[in-house]
Amino acid sequence: MFRSLIKSLQTGARTSGIRKMTSYGDYVKFMELVGNVKQLKRTGWVLRSVNDPETVASHMYRMAMLSFLIPEASSLDGIKCMKMALIHDLAEAIVGDITPYCGIDRAEKQRREHKAIHEISSLVPTMAGDEILKLFDEYEGQTTDEALWVKDCDRYDMIQQAFEYEKRDEVPMKHQEFFESTRGKFVNPFFLHMVEELNKQREEYHENFTARLEKTNHSSSS
């Protein structure tokens, strides 16, 4: 499937007998827009003054890597999940990372992102562009097993990232709100187990951190 995508980028594609001509200039522009998400900091972390927060691209990358962990017995299309993860926030290359705190309602957010993803997909040949649009709309619709998996990836990456910031900055339980926001929302059993393990490690870190702090304070007061 990756070969067919690369081939379409190189030679163009046909849909309903219509050939869309694209140029290497379009490809450079496409890659420039993709590059925007490599620099775009995720709004949720910025608003909470997290030092050196992750970018949108790094978030999507780890979501895509989760596709390698799809259980072997699963009927999920792993390549499709990986592609969907890599494009689900691609519209943010143009509109930015819009969150509920930005003062923009959901309908307007969807309108802006829909316009942006069409602009981005127009820079690649028809077959590739159609696939980008289809995957984007499928994710937004949340009606397929793959879309539900990728949404779970989105939620899971966020809470693992929150825990990693807690450890890096030595602020146990500081980002509890992110865990609360995902509680009861995971669908796939795989992620239920992942969240259980993550919470276990987070509690252990909190307990160990507290014990070390109490020991340090006791030594200082002696």
Can you describe what each PLM-predicted range is?
Residues 2-222:
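Alpha-helical, largely C-terminal catalytic domains
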